[in-house]
């Protein structure tokens, strides 16, 4: 918004020449981070008071951690604060003609809406299950598949008109069209090594990354500050990849595919980092507010979408290792319990409690120890991921 205003003012008079600073992506990214941070810090107390007044408090299940019983009633659905700060800062500082930012906003707000309905049913309607699994996965699939099909064509072409032409050409070919190498799955640490996915393969991978990341972040969001800081770290690292792939010079030098327009995602990533830090101010132990599904599902979906656009799905898998392990721990626990119950007549567990962070709590770790150690691991994983920029 401000970029368009600055460009318009420059056409009116040379006196507005100083507004050329708005053309610099790095400046707008820094301002987006600062804007989201300030908006989050200023609006945070009001949002928390409103949530408390509406009695939107976090229910704690009886079979959960005993040490978490004191958290019962803490305001939840604080993810609306994060999403508002991200959306406000992004819309203020990004180039409105950029299609990649719009699709990331679509996924973010789409998953946020799904999470909002889930939280509302749990907290307000007192339905412990919230949205049923099939219903939730259906709507997640709708958002994920729409994003997958759109990105298939928008990554391949640089203009919306060419995107539309490519879509019709794909349909006319019987869904058997050769796409540019840009949509291939890149393998980190190796020069110019990639695996062709094809159109359908790309859509399936995109769907799995977006929906998987959304649910993985949601599963991680179980302790004060546990999920939000890894989101900030991974999002910031993905912003670096977005800047590289969006630059014809840097992408050529570092042997990355050049995806025109993807650099603008740095503005969104910066806004997400600023909003995340603002939320952490209120979410750090002891938390004044919880993110809820409205925030966790949305942020996970956003990270997955950005990873797909910048063609760094495997690197995202590495940097978001905490999210991956948390999700695997839940799946392994459920599958092993069902298997042993069927075979031995009684369900057995791999972990003391799932997700993994609760296992460590049951093992004697304090909540703050689990959180900070998971942060440190995420920081190391992000550094490994960033090293793939040069170590190839």
Curated annotation (Swiss-Prot):
Keywords: Cell cycle, Cell division, Cell inner membrane, Cell membrane, Cell shape, Cell wall biogenesis/degradation, Magnesium, Membrane, Metal-binding, Peptidoglycan synthesis, Transferase, Transmembrane, Transmembrane helix. The chain crosses the membrane at residues 28-48, 74-94, 100-120, 137-157, 193-213, 225-245, 262-282, 289-309, 314-334, 369-389. Its EC number is 2.7.8.13. It catalyses: UDP-N-acetyl-alpha-D-muramoyl-L-alanyl-gamma-D-glutamyl-meso-2,6-diaminopimeloyl-D-alanyl-D-alanine + di-trans,octa-cis-undecaprenyl phosphate = di-trans,octa-cis-undecaprenyl diphospho-N-acetyl-alpha-D-muramoyl-L-alanyl-D-glutamyl-meso-2,6-diaminopimeloyl-D-alanyl-D-alanine + UMP. Its cofactor is Mg(2+). Its main location: membrane. One of its GO terms (biological process) is cell division. It is found in: Cell inner membrane. It is a multi-pass membrane protein. One of its GO terms (molecular function) is UDP-N-acetylmuramoyl-L-alanyl-D-glutamyl-meso-2,6-diaminopimelyl-D-alanyl-D-alanine:undecaprenyl-phosphate transferase activity. GO terms for cellular component: plasma membrane. Pathway: Cell wall biogenesis; peptidoglycan biosynthesis. NCBIfam families: mraY (TIGR00445). Catalyzes the initial step of the lipid cycle reactions in the biosynthesis of the cell wall peptidoglycan: transfers peptidoglycan precursor phospho-MurNAc-pentapeptide from UDP-MurNAc-pentapeptide onto the lipid carrier undecaprenyl phosphate, yielding undecaprenyl-pyrophosphoryl-MurNAc-pentapeptide, known as lipid I. Belongs to the glycosyltransferase 4 family. MraY subfamily. This is Phospho-N-acetylmuramoyl-pentapeptide-transferase. It comes from Variovorax paradoxus (strain S110).
